Amino acid sequence: MVYKTLFALCILTAGWRVQSLPTSAPLSVSLPTNIVPPTTIWTSSPQNTDADTASPSNGTHNNSVLPVTASAPTSLLPKNISIESREEEITSPGSNWEGTNTDPSPSGFSSTSGGVHLTTTLEEHSSGTPEAGVAATLSQSAAEPPTLISPQAPASSPSSLSTSPPEVFSASVTTNHSSTVTSTQPTGAPTAPESPTEESSSDHTPTSHATAEPVPQEKTPPTTVSGKVMCELIDMETTTTFPRVIMQEVEHALSSGSIAAITVTVIAVVLLVFGVAAYLKIRHSSYGRLLDDHDYGSWGNYNNPLYDDS
């Protein structure tokens, strides 16, 4: 029985430690390739399996440090981040367009060490509704100017999880295949500015915005206080509140009438005791032993020195 108890305690302790430790594994971004016409979902190229570094597009906002990694699997995981775009109309079956952004914005992605080419392809299914599958190919070319990836990268920190609605983080993705972790800037509205110079055959310029899906993650337990500190706090609270509680209980238990009745009863008992004692003493001192001693068979009491028969 003792061994079973120790084993159960070890299991509970290990589980508590695992839950208390923050998850340090980076989030893997895997996105579907087929979408509905009003939405476009971006997937990273299978050739790029290394972790991309996220560098802030606006240098004044360096508040938090979050890892952003892109992986090649196309299957959806519980920790997926899907990027939806606004309603767009694409007329050509296959069109290639590049967007360059010269105005740095905190909600856009601008590569710092290389250009990012964005190719767009269209796929049609048997149902007749065209669905756009967009494959983002990352290539290093230092000679080209920085290219804009219009969708934002919603990143969520695994260690800091709040109960408030998830914020959308905008970060800049570089293509130098390094694992340097930089900060991201939270933006309140998930909107991205349109690229000033965009060449596309569609009537409307596709403006994409990123929405972060709630990622099911384990919540870190609240800060635990040691048992000794808890015991000391409880002892302090009990010692300070104990006399007050007793006084309140006494006040509630004994009303003014009860206190008066108890006082009168005690006084009456004391008076009765003293009265009986005084009565017995007076009686004994008055008669002495005249009524008790009849040694000589007469009314005289010769043993009493106060009584003189002569």
UniProtKB/Swiss-Prot annotation:
Tissue: Widely expressed with highest levels in heart, kidney and placenta.
Topology in the lipid bilayer: Single-pass type I membrane protein
UniProt key word Magnesium: no
Location of region: Disordered: 40-225
Phosphoserine modification, residue list: 298
Main location: membrane
Record's subcellular location: Cell membrane; Golgi apparatus membrane; Endosome membrane
Induction info: By androgens.
Post-translational modification: Highly N-glycosylated and O-glycosylated.
Signal peptide range in chain numbering: 1-20
Stretches that traverse the bilayer: 259-279
Entry function: May regulate TLP1 expression and telomerase activity, thus enabling certain prostatic cells to resist apoptosis.
Protein name: Prostate androgen-regulated mucin-like protein 1
Organism: Homo sapiens
Taxonomic lineage: Eukaryota, Metazoa, Chordata, Craniata, Vertebrata
Gene that this polypeptide is encoded by: PARM1
